[in-house]
């Protein structure tokens, strides 16, 4: 799977997971309607399905996905929560994405 497609799929997967967790947060912490649990459940089911689309071993996919999830969560912090990330947030994202790239794209024996 080409690298750009892999990272793009990870990004879409992260959005599905974050939405699936953010909607119950809105219900529990912000007093929003319980009906948010329906799209949350759909989003989490989509998240699980998207993880199955990668041809790599599941454990490797889950480990590498974490790096893109961290990037997406910090982006969410900035765009949705309105909190500007710190320099340390950006450093952490860089380290996580570097780890993701090493895990997913390093050469493997055939």
Swiss-Prot record:
Bilayer-crossing regions: 7-27, 33-53, 63-83, 85-105
Bilayer topology annotation: Multi-pass membrane protein
Subcellular location field: Cell inner membrane
InterPro entries: UPF0060
Keywords: Cell inner membrane, Cell membrane, Membrane, Transmembrane, Transmembrane helix
Cellular component GO terms, alphabetical: plasma membrane
Highest taxon of source: Bacteria
Main location: membrane
Pfam families in the record: UPF0060
Recorded family membership: Belongs to the UPF0060 family.
Name the UniProt record assigns to this protein: UPF0060 membrane protein PBPRB0495
Biological source species: Photobacterium profundum (strain SS9)
Origin organism lineage: Bacteria, Pseudomonadati, Pseudomonadota, Gammaproteobacteria, Vibrionales
């Amino acid at each position: 799977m080409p690298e750009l497609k892999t990272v793009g799929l990870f990004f879409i997967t992260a959005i599905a997971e974050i939405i699936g967790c953010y909607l119950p947060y809105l219900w529990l912490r912000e007093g929003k309607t319980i009906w948010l649990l329906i799209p949350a459940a759909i989003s989490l089911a989509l998240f699980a399905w998207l993880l199955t689309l990668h041809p790599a071993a599941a454990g490797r996919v889950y480990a590498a996905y974490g790096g893109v999830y961290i990037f997406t969560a910090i982006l969410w912090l900035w765009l949705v929560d309105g909190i500007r990330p710190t320099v340390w947030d950006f450093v952490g994202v860089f380290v996580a994405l570097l780890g993701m790239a090493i895990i997913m794209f390093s050469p493997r024996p055939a």
